[in-house]
């Protein structure tokens, strides 16, 4: 993995996006970075290790090429503005989800279920009355 400066990272990230524009994906991770290069021991803590300031570790990969950068808290605002502009420019290939079809399908299914419940309740209500009020009710009772 290549550790780059923030400006070089943004340039390489743009290249990754351009390379994967037609097919492929770019995976980006962001996490807090305390400056350690070795893992934390299981038993006990390392004494005397105090991180100077908060840092973020950004990693990006397309599956083959990996790049990373560390952004300190002092330059995070500048980096965030450049990073957000880069994401807006290169995430235009995303597909929008069609939410209207889902709501139409669920409304149609709910309407059909309500009609079935109403149809099942109508003959039962007509059977409980002594004299049918409409010809449709007589047909419903005759069908039973």
Swiss-Prot record:
Name of this chain's protein: Signal recognition particle 14 kDa protein
Chief place where the protein resides: cytoplasm
Biological role: Component of the signal recognition particle (SRP) complex, a ribonucleoprotein complex that mediates the cotranslational targeting of secretory and membrane proteins to the endoplasmic reticulum (ER). SRP9 together with SRP14 and the Alu portion of the SRP RNA, constitutes the elongation arrest domain of SRP. The complex of SRP9 and SRP14 is required for SRP RNA binding.
Gene Ontology molecular function terms on file: 7S RNA binding; endoplasmic reticulum signal peptide binding
UniProt gene name: SRP14
GO cellular component assignments: signal recognition particle, endoplasmic reticulum targeting
Family: Belongs to the SRP14 family.
Domain of life: Eukaryota
UniProt-annotated location(s): Cytoplasm
One Pfam family recorded for the sequence: SRP14
Keyword terms: Cytoplasm, Phosphoprotein, Ribonucleoprotein, RNA-binding, Signal recognition particle
Modification sites for Phosphotyrosine: 27
Subunit structure: Heterodimer with SRP9; binds RNA as heterodimer. Component of a signal recognition particle (SRP) complex that consists of a 7SL RNA molecule of 300 nucleotides and six protein subunits: SRP72, SRP68, SRP54, SRP19, SRP14 and SRP9.
UniProt GO BP: SRP-dependent cotranslational protein targeting to membrane
């Amino acid at each position: 993995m290549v550790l780059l400066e923030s400006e070089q990272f943004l340039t390489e990230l743009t290249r990754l996006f351009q390379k994967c524009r037609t097919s492929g994906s770019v995976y980006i991770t962001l996490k807090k970075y305390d400056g350690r290069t070795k893992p934390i021991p299981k038993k006990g803590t390392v004494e005397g290790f105090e991180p100077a300031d908060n840092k973020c570790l950004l990693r990006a990969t397309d599956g083959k090429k990996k790049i990373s950068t560390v952004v300190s808290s002092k330059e995070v605002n500048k980096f965030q503005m450049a990073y957000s502009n880069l994401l807006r420019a290169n995430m235009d290939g995303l597909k929008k989800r069609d939410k209207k079809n889902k709501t139409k399908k669920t409304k149609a299914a709910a309407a059909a279920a309500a009609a079935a419940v109403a149809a099942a309740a109508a003959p039962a209500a007509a059977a409980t009355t002594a004299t049918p009020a409409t010809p449709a009710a007589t047909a419903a009772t005759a069908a039973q």
